[in-house]
A protein has these predicted regions:
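An aromatic- and histidine-rich active-site surface loop
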Residues: 23, 94-109, 119-142
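Short glycine-/acidic-enriched loop or helix-start segments at secondary-structure transitions
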Residues: 24-25, 56-57, 89, 132-135
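Short helix-terminating capping/connector loops at secondary-structure junctions
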Residues: 7-8, 115-119
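Glycine-centered short loops/turns at secondary-structure junctions
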Residues: 41, 142-143
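N-terminal subdomain of nucleotide-sugar transferases
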Residues: 2-73
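Hydrophobic helix-cap positions at the C-terminus of alpha-helices
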Residues: 37, 112-113, 138
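Short, solvent-exposed loop/turn segments at secondary-structure junctions
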Residues: 19-20, 51-52, 84-85, 128-130
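A conserved catalytic-core segment of Leloir-type glycosyltransferases
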Residues: 48-112, 116
Length: 143
C-alpha cells in the first residue's frame, strides 16, 4: 500500500461476507473500515452478501436477483446472493454455499468499479476462508 505513504488516494476492492445494513459482527467491522478509508479519500468497491445474517435467510425486500450494484459517494457496493441453507446444522451444505458465494463474489470483484480498471489493492475479510483465495485471484487479474 505504497499509496498511503506518498499521499496518493488508493483504489481498493473490499471482499466481505457482511456489510451494513447486514450487521453481523464482521459487518460492523467492515462497514467501519470502509467508511474510515473513504473519509481519507480512497475509492472503494465493496463486494458482499445481500443482508441475511439475522434470520439465516435473505431479508425481505432484498431477494429476487443474484446480485445488485449500488453507487455510493466513495465507490460502489455489489451485493450477491449468499446461498444460505435452511439450517446451520448441515455442514456440507454450508460449505457448498460458502464456495458458491465466494465464486460469485470473485466474478463480481473482477468488474467492481468498472472494467477493466486496475486497483491498488484488495482487502478480503475471512471467514469464510474461501474469500482469502478469492481476494488473491482478484488481485492477480486487477493489478
Amino acid at each position: 500500500m505504497n499509496g498511503v505513504m506518498n499521499g496518493k488516494n488508493l483504489r481498493l476492492v473490499v471482499l466481505c461476507p457482511h456489510f451494513a445494513p447486514d450487521m453481523a459482527p464482521t459487518g460492523v467491522v467492515m462497514t467501519r473500515i470502509v467508511h474510515e478509508l473513504a473519509a481519507l479519500g480512497h475509492e472503494l468497491h465493496v463486494v458482499t452478501a445481500l443482508p441475511w445474517y439475522r434470520e439465516h435467510a435473505i431479508e425481505t425486500g432484498w431477494g429476487g436477483r443474484l446480485w445488485r450494484v449500488e453507487k455510493t459517494a466513495w465507490g460502489s457496493i455489489t451485493r450477491v446472493h449468499p446461498f444460505p441453507g435452511k439450517t446451520k446444522r448441515n455442514l456440507l451444505r454450508r460449505a457448498f454455499g460458502f464456495v458458491l458465494f465466494s465464486a460469485v463474489v470473485g466474478l463480481r470483484s473482477l468488474v467492481a468499479g468498472g472494467l477493466p480498471r486496475r486497483v491498488d489493492g484488495v482487502l478480503a475479510m475471512s471467514p469464510p476462508l474461501t474469500l482469502g483465495l478469492t481476494g488473491w485471484f482478484t488481485k492477480l487479474f486487477r493489478s
